[in-house]
Amino acid sequence: MERVLIVNADDFGLSKGQNYGIVEAYRNGVVTSTTALVNGEAIDHAAQLSRELPALGVGMHFVLTLGKLVSEMPGLTRDGLLGKWIWQMAEEDTLPLDEIAHELACQYQRFIDVFGREPTHLDSHHHVHMFPQIFPIVAHFAAQRGIALRIDRQTVLNADDLPSDLRSTQGFSSEFYGEEITEACFLRILDASAHRGEASLEVMCHPAFVDNIIRQSAYCYPRLTELEVLTSASLKAAIAERGYRPGCFLDI
């Protein structure tokens, strides 16, 4: 059975170092797709680079935890900025869902304005779209527009509630992250997916070159390690040996 492998690099547009790392991992490695933060400091730079790489799938990285909003959103911002207090609000069930739905639409339009096309798919920064309160909003938004959505099926409480026409990969992994960023880890993800019989798999990653913006991130130097692993010739060969076909979300 042929299996589609999507290696998606998050955080396109966060910084020039992030952008260049993603492009390097695409040109000389196994990355096949990326998702862009439309409020990132280097989003215009990301769009410029993407025009030189028409085969690179570019989706939208919905942001509710970092930087400035595209719309007005007093219910979630503090001093005009987003932050990680969204987790506490989710636990207290005080999220401004109407504002979030409006911000999603505004970020989507901003993506089209910057990139000149619709995104290939949607996911989110820090996986906020998987919050139980937010997921239905994003899932129906994606289904209405016919674009794919990253779904962590271990997080979705009731798969029966998914829109019938919503596209996603059968498998998703965020395990290539943190302390163990190795070729062996990456291949274990593939082997586990194959064992489950999944015909399509998305692996999340964050390859980057370190610059001043990336240095401010709690997840900084591991991005360089990711880049090293993702551009290794041995990893590319091992993926091919396992029968995976590189693809993007337009292929599912």
Swiss-Prot record:
Query: For Mg(2+), which residues are the binding ones?
Result: H61, H125
Instruction: List the record's Gene Ontology CC terms alphabetically.
Output: cytoplasm
Which reaction(s) does its UniProt entry say it catalyses?
N,N'-diacetylchitobiose + H2O = N-acetyl-beta-D-glucosaminyl-(1->4)-D-glucosamine + acetate; diacetylchitobiose-6'-phosphate + H2O = N'-monoacetylchitobiose-6'-phosphate + acetate
- Which keywords does this Swiss-Prot/TrEMBL entry list? Carbohydrate metabolism, Chitin degradation, Cytoplasm, Hydrolase, Magnesium, Metal-binding, Polysaccharide degradation
Chief localization class?
cytoplasm
Q: Which GO terms describe its molecular function?
A: chitin disaccharide deacetylase activity; deacetylase activity; metal ion binding
Cofactors needed by this protein, per the record, are: Mg(2+)
Name where it's found: Cytoplasm
The answer to whether UniProt assigns keyword ATP-binding to this entry is no
EC category: hydrolase
Please provide the Gene Ontology terms (biological process) for this protein: chitin catabolic process; diacetylchitobiose catabolic process; polysaccharide catabolic process
According to its UniProt entry, what is the function of this protein?
Answer: Involved in the degradation of chitin. ChbG is essential for growth on the acetylated chitooligosaccharides chitobiose and chitotriose but is dispensable for growth on cellobiose and chitosan dimer, the deacetylated form of chitobiose. Deacetylation of chitobiose-6-P and chitotriose-6-P is necessary for both the activation of the chb promoter by the regulatory protein ChbR and the hydrolysis of phosphorylated beta-glucosides by the phospho-beta-glucosidase ChbF.
Q: Partners and quaternary state?
A: Homodimer.
How is this protein named in the record? Chitooligosaccharide deacetylase
